């Protein structure tokens, strides 16, 4: 089981892509969060306390530069490989200059299927989460997302990798 510890570090508005289900970012930041998910049942399952919107990450209806932060918390594995670059580009479009874009996810060579167990600590609460991909042939790794971010007016700030999981944070360029 992989452990993720989250603390409140952001001020301002947060767009959480794939924020249904356990609603981890929404639990942490509450009303600061607008969580989108393309599955109604995931949004219905998420706890209350933050805005939830049914929306596709590749075609967001938000105005450009609408959010101070954009997060993907174990979401990319659920976005088809051929749509991930578009989702990142849309996230960057919605991000204000100087804002941060963050990805937490798992690296895996091949889904046959792939399942990972997480112990997520949100303040003093522990939330056990299972994430899995059943699409045969699916794979992802840190390097792929670093390459995808190229050309998106982002400067890499943090890159951490441990136990088959990774965390990336970029800041959107101001000019």
What are the residue ranges of the model-derived segments?
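Conserved alpha-helix/loop element of class I SAM-dependent methyltransferases that forms part
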Residues: 1-11
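Class I SAM-dependent methyltransferase SAM/SAH-binding core
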Residues: 15-59
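C-terminal alpha-helical "lid/dimerization" subdomain adjacent to the S-adenosyl-L-methionine
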Residues: 104-159
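Core SAM-dependent methyltransferase catalytic element
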Residues: 150-175
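A short acidic, Gly/Pro-enriched loop at the edge of an enzyme's catalytic core
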Residues: 58-70
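A short SAM/SAH-binding and catalytic strip from SAM-dependent methyltransferases
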Residues: 69-83
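A short glycine-rich, Lys/Arg-flanked "PGG" loop and its adjoining helix->strand segment in the class I
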Residues: 85-97
């Amino acid at each position: 089981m992989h452990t993720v510890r989250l603390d409140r570090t952001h001020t301002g508005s947060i767009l959480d892509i794939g924020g249904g289900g356990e609603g981890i970012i929404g639990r942490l930041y509450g009303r600061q969060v607008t969580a989108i998910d393309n599955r109604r049942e995931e949004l219905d399952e998420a706890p209350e306390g933050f805005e939830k919107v049914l929306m596709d990450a590749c075609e967001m209806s938000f105005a450009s530069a609408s959010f101070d932060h954009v997060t993907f918390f174990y979401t990319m594995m659920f976005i088809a490989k051929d749509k991930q670059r578009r989702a990142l580009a849309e996230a960057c479009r919605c991000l204000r200059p100087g804002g941060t874009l963050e990805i937490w996810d798992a690296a895996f060579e091949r889904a046959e299927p792939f399942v990972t167990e997480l112990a997520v600590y949100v303040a003093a609460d522990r939330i056990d989460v299972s994430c899995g991909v059943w699409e045969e042939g699916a794979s992802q790794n840190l390097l792929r997302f670093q390459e995808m971010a190229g050309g998106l007016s982002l400067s890499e700030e943090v890159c951490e990798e441990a136990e088959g999981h990774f965390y990336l944070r970029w800041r959107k360029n101001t000019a």
